[in-house]
Amino acid sequence: MEMLQGLLLLWLLLLNVGGVWTSREPLRPLCRPINATLAAENEACPVCVTFTTTICAGYCPSMMRVLPAALPPVPQPVCTYRELRFASVRLPGCPPGVDPVVSFPVALSCRCGPCRLSSSDCGGPRAQPLACDRPPLPGLLFL
């Protein structure tokens, strides 16, 4: 009986660390690069430009303590950049002296880890998607 309990415990541990879990289709999409449409604008320029880039999104395994009162909170991992590069779009119609170039990150690979406010928005889902205050301009002007 003890051997059976040991095997069951080993199987559950493997399932938890991903050995068995990742070999099958997960219930939720794991952290990975996905295409997303974003918007860029500048207060001094007359239009908003929408563009498609690759962002990190998806599920990261997390834990929650059952008895949280006496222990500090467990840091929750977020889906964030592992590798990225930067691309740019040019906002048309900007007056002289205003930089029309807006740079944005392009996710090359993603990972689950602590949120770095220097490169990620860790605020969670929004009630409304990020949108432009200015009229949108169809079409992309990549540099």
Curated annotation (Swiss-Prot):
Q: What is its main location?
A: secreted
Question: Where do glycans attach?
Answer: N35
Signal peptide location:
1-22
Classification via InterPro entries: Cystine-knot_cytokine (IPR029034), Glyco_hormone_CN (IPR006208), Gonadotropin_bsu (IPR001545), Gonadotropin_bsu_CS (IPR018245)
The cellular component terms of Gene Ontology attached to this UniProt record, alphabetical and capped at eight, are: cytoplasm; extracellular space
- Keywords associated with the record: Disulfide bond, Glycoprotein, Hormone, Secreted, Signal
Tell me which SUPFAM superfamilies the record gives. Answer: Cystine-knot cytokines (SSF57501)
One Pfam family assigned to this protein is Cys_knot
Q: What's the domain of life for this entry?
A: Eukaryota
Q: List the disulfide bonds.
A: C31-C79, C45-C94, C48-C132, C56-C110, C60-C112, C115-C122
Q: Name one GO molecular function term.
A: hormone activity
Q: Where in the cell is it found?
A: Secreted
Q: Which GO terms describe its biological process?
A: G protein-coupled receptor signaling pathway
Listed SMART domains: GHB
The Swiss-Prot or TrEMBL record describes its family as follows:
Belongs to the glycoprotein hormones subunit beta family.
Q: What does this protein do?
A: Promotes spermatogenesis and ovulation by stimulating the testes and ovaries to synthesize steroids.
Self-association or partners: how does it assemble?
Heterodimer of a common alpha chain and a unique beta chain which confers biological specificity to thyrotropin, lutropin, follitropin and gonadotropin.
Q: What is this protein called?
A: Lutropin subunit beta
- Where does this protein come from, organism-wise? Felis catus (Cat)
